[in-house]
Amino acid sequence: MPFLRQIARRRARSLFDLCAGFVYSQVLLACVRLRILEALASGPRQITDLAREARLPEEAMRTLLRAAAALQLVQWRGDAEHCRLGSQGAALLGNPGLLPMIAHHALLYADLADPVALLRGELRDGQLAPYWGYAGSDRPAAATEPSVAPYSGLMSASQGLVAQQILAAYSLRRHRSLLDVGGGDGTFATLAARDNPSLHVTCFDLPAVAELARARIARAGLGARVQAASGDFLSQPLPAGSDVVSLIRVLHDHGDAQAVRLLRAVRAALPAHGTLLIAEPMSGTPGAARVSDVYFGFYLLAMGSGRARTPTQLTRLLRAAGFAAPRLHATALPMAARVLVTHCSTGRSVKTS
């Protein structure tokens, strides 16, 4: 029957995608490393020119472009001698924070070459864990600027993908002062300050990272309302005085014990009825299991610390730290980040809005 054949073909394609996914990711990585998408940004290009600029044999470039066309990164223009951006390629260029992340994935792919060794904790000389030096360090506050600059830059590049969603999901206009804990180079802090002209913001991170934040704040001309403070939030008190604290893509980097320790430090820094805003990818997000459970599940495993949690699991940690039941605030792209907001009191369940 025709409809049964269609179902069988659809399942066969899905199964093949599952088997060939690594090849797809490597085609994408090659396009990013060779800057193929940027080369096509201004319009169609001839294959011979692309091959020369990328220092590839022409036939190798054709192989890459055929693969990229199948993935909708590029598309042929009539004569098969010219190509232009495809729909997926244009979407990637429209989200510039994705390109550094794709290039960075080479470290993850190296660690996933033997997934069983990774799962057993037998991976030797992993690539990803050293990149995020603070994750396994006994003295993260001693990190130097050269060691924190790469990951701080990566987080900054991808922060733009989620920051506006967070600010749209929860208005900070009702608050007078924000403490952004684990705020990196100040990307979210400066965006929040621009979005809320009366808001004072403190960006808190490790000393070397805080120096990067100070430079960004100065470049943004926001020094009158935004400052950077430094310390180790797992071993030192947080700056007090703010009525709202944000943890943007922070908790999922840490195990439960460390997460509760951080949440208790946040609770101690907040006034009575102060507000905590949590934003990060969460497990159990409808339609986003491949993001939270596949991608972040294995990324954080290779990183050596943390896990994606469901809102209910986060609620348990919050209650253990003295917070009320949080409320989920809808975001435009929940696969990238969901937003939980809670207050300093006790509570029992996750509410949604």
Task: State each model region's role.
Residues 2-34, 38-44, 52-53, 58-176:
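Conserved Class I S-adenosyl-L-methionine-dependent methyltransferase catalytic core
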Residues 76, 85, 278, 325-328:
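Short beta-strand "wing" residues that participate in macromolecule-binding interfaces
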